[in-house]
């Protein structure tokens, strides 16, 4: 069996069933909340870090609730990832919707602003004591592998994040921007009123 995909420019590509199944398998394996990091923070760099942000290791598909719990507890709102997931986790999406990431902290009395960020803004917020939740995409081609993480610091070479099961992991600026730009630099700033 062959599947035929037609594109707007009238070109047609033929993908054999084995190739289609391979793409489907890759899509399945690259699920929401995939976490990738570059490793430890380089020792020789001057790091700017907000050190007292609570860390919650994420469970499967729970990067949104884990990220929100860390930032909200930083602002002294006592919630757990499980509390948050009960209210905003979507089983059908196997994750958390972006809009729910904004609405949930607002319902708990915090200011939550979602916008398209940049590195300068990210650094300014970290310097001011505001951790940011960012939405990145580790996927390739048409396959998305979305993930929320908390930016807790930076240095001249990259960012320091709480992501997945990793607290304070370093990601080079180049790698970070490649994944962040795929989401149009989705950024969530949460702060007290």
Give each language-model segment a name.
Residues 2-31:
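Sec-dependent bacterial lipoprotein signal peptides
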Residues 101:
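Compact soluble domain cores
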Residues 16, 30-94, 98, 119, ...:
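Active-site-adjacent structural segments surrounding the nucleophilic cysteine of cysteine proteases
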């Amino acid at each position: 069996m062959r599947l035929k995909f037609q594109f707007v420019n009238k070109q047609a590509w033929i993908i054999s069933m084995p190739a289609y199944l391979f793409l489907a398998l890759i899509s399945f394996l690259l699920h929401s909340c995939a976490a990738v990091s570059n490793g430890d923070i380089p020792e020789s760099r001057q790091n700017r870090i907000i050190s007292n942000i609570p860390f919650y290791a994420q469970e499967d598909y729970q990067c949104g609730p884990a990220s929100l719990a860390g930032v909200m507890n930083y602002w002294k709102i006592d919630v757990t990832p499980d509390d948050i997931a009960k209210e905003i986790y979507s089983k059908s999406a196997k994750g958390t919707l972006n809009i729910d990431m904004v609405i949930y902290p607002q319902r708990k009395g915090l200011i939550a602003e979602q916008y398209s960020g940049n590195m300068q803004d990210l650094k300014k917020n970290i310097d001011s004591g505001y951790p940011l939740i960012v939405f990145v995409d580790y996927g390739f081609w048409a396959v998305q592998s979305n993930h929320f993480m908390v930016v807790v610091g930076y240095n001249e070479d990259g960012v320091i994040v709480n992501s997945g099961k990793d607290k304070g992991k370093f990601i080079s600026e180049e790698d970070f921007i490649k994944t962040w730009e795929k989401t149009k630099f989705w950024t969530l700033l949460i702060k007290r009123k």
